[in-house]
């Protein structure tokens, strides 16, 4: 009986030693058999893929909560047949994606604001230039009007002076014309009184009186 026990014990010891030896030899071999990258590092696990249903449920949860508690993470993992680590990684990636989206929206809004400010500035500059051009045209028109009125007033003054010299004392000119006409008329009357015999005395007296007044 003792021999049997000793034999059994020795077999167990030998088996244990052989197992350890085999494990020590196999471990490096298994490490060598693992796929490695060109730089010698072991290849990482493939990216986790999520089904359409899982992605939809995770998006719904992320819409309400960007951060999950441990309890809620475990519940979602059981409901979607995922591990807790997968849920945690998905939410981390989703938060990073949200930050990038917000940053992109902010940059777009900033660019739109700058473009709008530039357009407003260009519009204001064009309005100012148009106003200045209009004011300069108006000022030039006023200057031309003033110069034209001055020239007109100067020419009119000279013309009025010359016209005044020609038309000075119209009563005197009329009297001179009347003297000339009546003088010749008086000569004719004085020389030909016999021809005026047919006229009445009153008319002759009026004519003679007018002639005498003119000569005087």
From Swiss-Prot:
Keywords: Developmental protein, DNA-binding, Homeobox, Nucleus. Residues 128-152 have a biased composition (Low complexity). GO terms for molecular function: DNA-binding transcription factor activity; DNA-binding transcription factor activity, RNA polymerase II-specific; RNA polymerase II cis-regulatory region sequence-specific DNA binding. It holds the Pfam family Abdominal-A. Gene3D superfamilies: Homeodomain-like. This is Homeobox protein abdominal-A homolog. Residues 112-167 are annotated as: Disordered. It comes from Culex quinquefasciatus (Southern house mosquito). It is found in: Nucleus. Its main location: nucleus.
């Amino acid at each position: 009986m003792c021999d049997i026990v000793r034999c059994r014990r020795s077999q167990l010891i030998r088996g244990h030693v052989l197992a350890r030896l085999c494990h020590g030899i196999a471990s490096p071999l298994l490490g060598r058999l693992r796929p490695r990258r060109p730089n010698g590092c072991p290849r990482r696990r493939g990216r986790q893929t999520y089904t359409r249903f899982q992605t939809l449920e995770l998006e719904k949860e992320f819409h309400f909560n960007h951060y999950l508690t441990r309890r809620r993470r475990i519940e979602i993992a059981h409901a979607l047949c995922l591990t807790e680590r997968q849920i945690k990684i998905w939410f981390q990636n989703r938060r990073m994606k949200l930050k990038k989206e917000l940053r992109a929206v902010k940059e777009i809004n900033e660019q739109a604001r700058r473009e709008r400010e530039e357009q407003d500035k260009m519009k204001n500059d064009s309005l100012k230039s148009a106003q200045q051009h209009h004011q300069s045209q108006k000022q030039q028109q006023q200057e031309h009007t003033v110069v034209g009125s001055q020239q007109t007033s100067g020419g009119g003054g000279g013309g009025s002076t010359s016209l005044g010299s020609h038309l000075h004392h119209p009563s005197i000119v009329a009297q001179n014309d009347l003297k000339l006409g009546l003088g010749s008329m008086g000569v004719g009357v004085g020389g030909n009184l016999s021809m005026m015999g047919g006229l009445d005395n009153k008319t002759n007296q009026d004519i003679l009186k007018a002639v005498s007044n003119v000569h005087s």
